[in-house]
């Protein structure tokens, strides 16, 4: 696998109960390929396969590793060396928490600690694991103490910290819906925008049969001074607003854009908005619900 062709690779590891599963879920929602508990010795084979067959489907690969894997400590260093020879330099995220917090989490979930049993009680198992993983902690690019984090806190921190490591996580998906007010407002919209103030090509006999997908309609609606001013301010508003929703942990937002019939003004505006948001690295879907009715 050539270095230029490799997917970004992260290894999420650390103390049991510190939040590894939560972090893996966060990355999965962000369109990373995630896998937990994979034997260390087969990681290189997995990455070769993904680089060959899944380059366009995922933003990267996130591997969850911990002491439950029988070969973890013995093969961890060797696996890193093999990856580096392949041109892959994995980033390591190490999760930890104070012992009281970990003990409380295990007591709450009533799940046994992986090292608990025999002469080791829960508190001793937590400390023993901390000592065993000290060399792994030393290799980490990012150490997160999750003692005071809620699940939502952890999600926000993961996004922020990963960006500081050189990654880019534009997590919010924007769903655009166009509609005609005379057919009803979409019930699944988070926000509704009424564009009936814009010039209406419906009353131009040469334009009436066209739709907002046609250049003539787009020029009529957004090419005039009123349309240009509106669209610039509308886009600026959304580019300010959407990151605020991202910061609150939202995964998606649905914007409904309406005009009288849902064929001209709303469609042309939504088409332009989709293109503009994609240039800002948002994942955008677009549905014209009433374009054939208006």
UniProtKB/Swiss-Prot annotation:
What are the protein's UniProt keywords? ATP-binding, GTP-binding, Nucleotide-binding
Indicate which residues the UniProt annotation says bind ATP. 14-21
Intrachain S-S bonds: none
The residues listed in the UniProt record as binding GTP, with positions renumbered to this chain, are 66-69
Give the Gene Ontology MF terms in alphabetical order: ATP binding; GTP binding
What the entry lists under PANTHER family is as follows: RNASE ADAPTER PROTEIN RAPZ
Family recorded in the similarity comment: Belongs to the RapZ-like family.
What this chain does, per the entry, is described as: Displays ATPase and GTPase activities.
Q: What name goes with this protein?
A: Nucleotide-binding protein Dde_1774
Which species expresses this protein natively? Oleidesulfovibrio alaskensis (strain ATCC BAA-1058 / DSM 17464 / G20) (Desulfovibrio alaskensis)
Lineage of the native species?
Answer: Bacteria, Pseudomonadati, Thermodesulfobacteriota, Desulfovibrionia, Desulfovibrionales
């Amino acid at each position: 696998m050539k270095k230029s062709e490799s997917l970004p690779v992260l290894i999420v590891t650390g103390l049991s109960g510190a939040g590894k599963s939560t972090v893996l879920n966060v990355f999965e929602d962000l369109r990373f390929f995630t896998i937990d508990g994979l034997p260390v010795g087969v990681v290189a084979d997995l990455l070769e396969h993904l680089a060959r067959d899944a380059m366009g489907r995922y933003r990267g690969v996130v591997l969850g590793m911990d002491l439950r894997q029988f070969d973890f400590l013995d093969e961890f260093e060797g696996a890193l060396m093999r990856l580096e020879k392949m041109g892959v330099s994995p980033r390591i995220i190490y999760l930890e928490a104070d012992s009281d917090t970990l003990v409380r989490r295990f007591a709450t979930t009533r799940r046994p600690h992986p090292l608990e049993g025999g002469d080791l009680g829960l508190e001793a198992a937590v400390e023993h694991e901390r000592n065993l993983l000290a060399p792994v902690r030393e290799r980490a690019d990012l150490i997160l103490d999750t003692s005071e984090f809620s699940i939502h806190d952890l999600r926000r921190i993961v996004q922020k910290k990963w960006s500081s490591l050189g990654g880019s996580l534009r997590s919010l998906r924007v769903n655009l819906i166009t509609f005609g007010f005379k057919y009803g407002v979409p019930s699944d919209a988070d926000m509704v925008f009424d564009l009936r103030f814009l010039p209406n090509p419906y009353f131009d006999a040469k334009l009436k049969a066209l739709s907002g997908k046609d250049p003539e309609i787009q020029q009529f609606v957004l090419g005039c001074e009123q349309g240009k001013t509106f669209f610039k301010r509308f886009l600026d508003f959304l580019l300010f607003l959407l990151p605020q929703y991202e910061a609150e942990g939202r995964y998606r937002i649905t914007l409904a854009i309406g005009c009288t019939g849902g064929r001209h003004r709303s469609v042309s505006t939504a088409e332009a908005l989709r293109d503009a948001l994609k240039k800002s690295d948002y994942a955008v879907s677009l549905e014209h619900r009433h374009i054939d009715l208006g």
